[in-house]
Amino acid sequence: MASQPPQEPTPTATSTPSTSALASLPPHLDPTTYPRTLTSPTHNIHLELTYSPLNPSQALTHTSSPAAGANVLFLGTTRDTFEGRAVSQLSYTCYPPLALKTLLDIATKAAEKFRLEGVYIAHRLGVVPIQESSIVVAVSAGHRGMAWRAGEEVLEEVKARLEVWKREEFVDGGMEWRENRERDAEGKVVAEKQEERE
């Protein structure tokens, strides 16, 4: 993950950045140039980066297949606290060409490894309020075991590899850029706990 994320606009649902403000933004930071999508018909893969709210039903529609006996859907949502601090919202940014390339690699490898009928990954950018989804992962497979394992692996690969930067914004006015890492019930990074034991 890059050490310093690119700066981004923080559009809200109630206001739209002015045309003159957007004209000065590079295209990858301009919300009006989204959604950015990438598909691979070979493996029934659909990938999306968007500033709009995510649609879980759309994810299941994309992964639907007559050969699928199992569909797994994961929604990652913004929670209201982090390490005891009240969170007001999250904000995400990325460089789409690189992010879509990484997502395609993750989805293609999972489709081949788990013999998936479909893979859908959508990541929201910009401001994501409390209780709204920042990521949707859906997979379909012939049987539930493959679908469960594939869904989890796709999510963990996205968290580990995707070039998306997350800014946690707090009610007290503070903010922190964070890496997407797996945390335990106390909020501690799981990888760090494993390293401490070794």
Curated annotation (Swiss-Prot):
EC number: 2.8.1.12
Annotated spans, Disordered: 1-40, 176-198
Subcellular compartments: Cytoplasm
Residues that hold substrate according to the record: 143-144, 159, 166-168
Entry GO terms, CC: molybdopterin synthase complex
A Pfam family it matches: MoaE
Catalytic activity as recorded in UniProt: 2 [molybdopterin-synthase sulfur-carrier protein]-C-terminal-Gly-aminoethanethioate + cyclic pyranopterin phosphate + H2O = molybdopterin + 2 [molybdopterin-synthase sulfur-carrier protein]-C-terminal Gly-Gly + 2 H(+)
Biased composition (Low complexity): 1-27
Annotated metabolic or biological route of this protein: Cofactor biosynthesis; molybdopterin biosynthesis
Alphabetic keyword roster: Cytoplasm, Molybdenum cofactor biosynthesis, Transferase
Main localization (coarse): cytoplasm
InterPro entries documented for this protein: MoaE_sf, MOCS2B_euk, Mopterin_biosynth_MoaE
Top-level class of the enzyme under EC nomenclature: transferase
Domain of life of the organism encoding this protein: Eukaryota
MF (Gene Ontology): molybdopterin synthase activity
Any GO BP annotation: Mo-molybdopterin cofactor biosynthetic process
Record's subunit section: Heterotetramer; composed of 2 small (MOCS2A) and 2 large (MOCS2B) subunits.
Function in brief: Catalytic subunit of the molybdopterin synthase complex, a complex that catalyzes the conversion of precursor Z into molybdopterin. Acts by mediating the incorporation of 2 sulfur atoms from thiocarboxylated MOCS2A into precursor Z to generate a dithiolene group.
HAMAP family recorded: MOC2B
Similarity comment text for this entry: Belongs to the MoaE family. MOCS2B subfamily.
Protein name, UniProt field: Molybdopterin synthase catalytic subunit
